[in-house]
């Protein structure tokens, strides 16, 4: 299975840099087997059945991009340098792994000042990353980070514009609960309270799970034989209550439809024993054509990058030829792509 099998031409002007407003006004491509229909996200209840269950990732994106000043003492006095930090994940001991630009200007033992309230000591430089320990913890850290940090927009948006205050709302789901992600579960960005109420009135139920989306979600596949690709790991949890809800829906003949690839990867990780069960830990599950789905009966997701692991995932669900047709339709009909773009509802035949 070659990487080139998952390539397609995408006009640059189809990459969305702002989301649709209101959220549920984004377009929705519905693929049911070989049939393709054009719709709008707010019409999602029309495409689902009473008894269907949507699985929602309730991770909260932290404002993980920080700009600070490195302090260094020298014989000539204090020497400073501007440092850009992207937080990656917290360690068990309370420190944070982070990307730093330029990393070469940091040494162990130095301090980076981000604001009057927030600073971090450089504890180590390892594997191209900085290990930072902040001066604050808990709610105090969260509050200072909210003031000093910016949302970690995906690289294909950040290349076109800087993050701003609007992104702190736009790049967060309405049900975000557990802080820890450095990228949003973007299919979920299309939902607002009005749509959730309409779905509930239609008999659709919801289950919340947590997967903290990491920066590794944007890493390119660098091998031509995609089966040899090694996925990044992300922490997730499926509670006993969530597993029971999903199992009950399956037993009753309802469909389990994750909203977003993160929710899908998590519930399939929790079902490797054959059926859904409570689960917590790091998952590096890699879903590509030939994968045996145990839980997901469909998927709501945005449109993904060429040659990406997420394009491989949807190809596993729908079939490679079907996805080629779906994406050709999306490009021809000028759907907006990637994190702030339009959505698709994928229901295998």
From Swiss-Prot:
It holds the Pfam family Queuosine_synth. One of its GO terms (molecular function) is S-adenosylmethionine:tRNA ribosyltransferase-isomerase activity. Pathway: tRNA modification; tRNA-queuosine biosynthesis. The keyword Cytoplasm applies. Transfers and isomerizes the ribose moiety from AdoMet to the 7-aminomethyl group of 7-deazaguanine (preQ1-tRNA) to give epoxyqueuosine (oQ-tRNA). It catalyses: 7-aminomethyl-7-carbaguanosine(34) in tRNA + S-adenosyl-L-methionine = epoxyqueuosine(34) in tRNA + adenine + L-methionine + 2 H(+). InterPro entries: QueA, QueA_dom1, QueA_dom2, QueA_sf. One of its GO terms (cellular component) is cytoplasm. Monomer. It is found in: Cytoplasm. This is S-adenosylmethionine:tRNA ribosyltransferase-isomerase. Belongs to the QueA family. Keywords: Cytoplasm, Queuosine biosynthesis, S-adenosyl-L-methionine, Transferase. Its EC number is 2.4.99.17. HAMAP family: QueA. It comes from the Bacteria. The keyword Nucleotide-binding does not apply. It comes from Ruegeria pomeroyi (strain ATCC 700808 / DSM 15171 / DSS-3) (Silicibacter pomeroyi). GO terms for biological process: queuosine biosynthetic process; tRNA wobble guanine modification.
């Amino acid at each position: 299975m070659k990487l080139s099998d998952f390539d397609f031409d995408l006009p640059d002007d189809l990459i969305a840099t702002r989301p649709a407003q209101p959220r549920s006004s984004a377009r929705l491509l519905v693929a049911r087997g070989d049939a393709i229909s054009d719709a709008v996200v707010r019409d999602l209840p029309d495409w689902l059945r009473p008894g269907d269950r949507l699985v929602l990732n309730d991770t909260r994106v932290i404002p993980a991009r920080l700009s600070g000043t490195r302090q260094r003492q020298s014989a000539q006095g204090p020497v400073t340098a501007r440092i850009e930090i992207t937080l990656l994940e917290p360690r068990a001991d309370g420190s944070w792994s982070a990307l730093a630009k330029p990393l070469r200007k940091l040494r162990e033992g130095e301090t980076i000042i981000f604001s009057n309230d927030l600073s971090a000591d450089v504890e180590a430089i390892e594997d191209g990353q900085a290990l930072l320990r902040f001066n604050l913890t808990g709610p105090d850290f969260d509050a200072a980070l909210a003031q000093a940090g910016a949302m970690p927009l995906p690289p294909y948006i950040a290349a076109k514009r800087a993050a701003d205050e609007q992104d702190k709302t736009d790049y967060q789901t309405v049900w975000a609960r557990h802080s820890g992600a450095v990228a949003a579960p973007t299919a979920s960005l299309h939902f607002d309270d009005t749509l959730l109420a309409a779905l509930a009135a239609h008999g659709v139920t919801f289950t919340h799970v947590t997967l903290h989306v990491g920066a590794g979600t944007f890493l390119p596949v660098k091998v031509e034989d995609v089966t040899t690709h090694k996925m990044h790991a992300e922490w997730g949890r499926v509670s006993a209550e969530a597993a029971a809800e999903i199992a009950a829906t399956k037993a009753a003949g309802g469909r389990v439809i994750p909203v977003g690839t993160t929710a899908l990867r998590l519930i399939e990780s929790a079902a490797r024993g054959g059926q859904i069960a409570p689960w917590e830990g790091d998952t590096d599950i890699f879903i590509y054509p030939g994968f045996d789905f145990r839980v997901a009966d469909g998927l709501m997701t945005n449109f993904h990058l060429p040659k990406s692991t997420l394009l491989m995932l949807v190809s596993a669900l729908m079939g490679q030829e079907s996805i080629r047709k779906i994406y050709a339709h999306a490009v021809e009909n000028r759907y907006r792509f990637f994190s702030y773009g339009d959505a698709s509802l994928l229901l295998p035949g």
